[in-house]
Amino acid sequence: MSKITKLFKSSGGSGSSSKNRKGPSAQEALFKLRETEEMLTKKQEYLEKKIELELATAKKHGTKNKRAALQALKKKKRLEKQLAQIDGTLSTIEFQREALENSHTNTEVLKNMGYAAKAMKAAHENMDLEKIDDLMQDIHEQQDVAQEISDAISRPVGFGDEFDEDELLEELEELEQEDLNSQMANVNLPSVPSSKLPSTKLPSRPASSRKKVEDDDDMQMLAAWAT
């Protein structure tokens, strides 16, 4: 067997083993990403302190030692470049971590929904739609029977069923009319005098006085009729 054949066989075997091997879980990947974020955050804080230190060095030397001041500023620029790269890397890792967290959340949600669907299916396996319809029909019938029983119990027995209310009202009106006619018949009107009174001419009264006398006479007649 040649070395080339052995190489292809070994590579094929490693390929099959790599296919059988599963990738990292979502929890493992998230753990690694958080570790990387923590490491880069510490590096970020270190670079920020170094930049402040180099800036202070450049200010310290100023015009007195331009060479040292320029050297400090060059270091500061290199550190700022590294800091910018770390900021970009952190943004990428943060985006990847959030996407992985969302993917893991969606996976768990779908898994739980699948469990719920299976449980619902298992619960409905022993249910027959025809039996459910029959059961609901029986329930409605029993509710109707219960309502009829309640109506029968709450209905008064022996009161109001054998009498017509309209006839009773008509009879009551007749009684009231008879009572009113009896009262009108018993009214004592004043008797008319049989002898003629002497025709003495009374002085004429003013129109207002005659009107007042007529009103008083009407009131007296009305009072006598009422008694």
Curated annotation (Swiss-Prot):
Keyword flag Transmembrane helix: no
Protein's cellular compartments: Cytoplasm, Cytosol; Late endosome membrane
Residues in a coiled coil are 32-94, 129-187
What is the membrane topology noted in the UniProt record heading this document? Peripheral membrane protein
Pfam families associated with the record: Snf7
Name the GO cellular-component terms: cytoplasmic side of plasma membrane; cytosol; ESCRT III complex; late endosome membrane; multivesicular body
Primary location: cytoplasm
**According to the UniProt record, where is the region Disordered?**
1-27, 178-227
Q: Where is the composition biased (Low complexity)?
A: 189-206
Q: List the PANTHER family hit by this protein, alphabetically.
A: CHARGED MULTIVESICULAR BODY PROTEIN, CHARGED MULTIVESICULAR BODY PROTEIN 4C
The family annotation for this protein states: Belongs to the SNF7 family.
Q: What does this protein do?
A: Probable core component of the endosomal sorting required for transport complex III (ESCRT-III) which is involved in multivesicular bodies (MVBs) formation and sorting of endosomal cargo proteins into MVBs. MVBs contain intraluminal vesicles (ILVs) that are generated by invagination and scission from the limiting membrane of the endosome and mostly are delivered to lysosomes enabling degradation of membrane proteins, such as stimulated growth factor receptors, lysosomal enzymes and lipids.
**Record note on quaternary structure:** Probable core component of the endosomal sorting required for transport complex III (ESCRT-III). ESCRT-III components are thought to multimerize to form a flat lattice on the perimeter membrane of the endosome.
Name listed for the protein in its UniProt record? Charged multivesicular body protein 4c
Q: Which organism is it from?
A: Xenopus laevis (African clawed frog)
